[in-house]
Amino acid sequence: MAVPKKKTSPSRRGMRRSHQALTGEAYTECSNCGELKRPHHVCGHCGHYDGREVAAAGNSGRGLKGVVRV
């Protein structure tokens, strides 16, 4: 089996792991209703995207579950 010839230094180990950092999810305000939504996604509360209504929320009261396209 292959075995490392030298011990990996903490600096090299850190440089290798520098791309593994986690970032939190970004949220923006819906321009129609003011609720928080993901950027570039349809608002789950009112169904608007980019100033237009693209989906109507069903009567279930659970956001866009059972979406009806407009």
UniProtKB/Swiss-Prot annotation:
Say if the entry is tagged with keyword ATP-binding: no
Similarity annotation: Belongs to the bacterial ribosomal protein bL32 family.
Please name the Gene3D superfamilies in this protein's record: Single helix bin (1.20.5.640)
Q: Identify a single GO molecular function assigned to this protein.
A: structural constituent of ribosome
Give GO BP annotations, semicolon-separated.
translation
Entry keywords, A to Z: Ribonucleoprotein, Ribosomal protein
Q: InterPro entries attached here?
A: Ribosomal_bL32, Ribosomal_bL32_bact, Ribosomal_zn-bd
Q: What is the lineage of its organism?
A: Bacteria, Pseudomonadati, Pseudomonadota, Alphaproteobacteria, Acetobacterales
Please report the name of this protein according to its UniProt entry: Large ribosomal subunit protein bL32
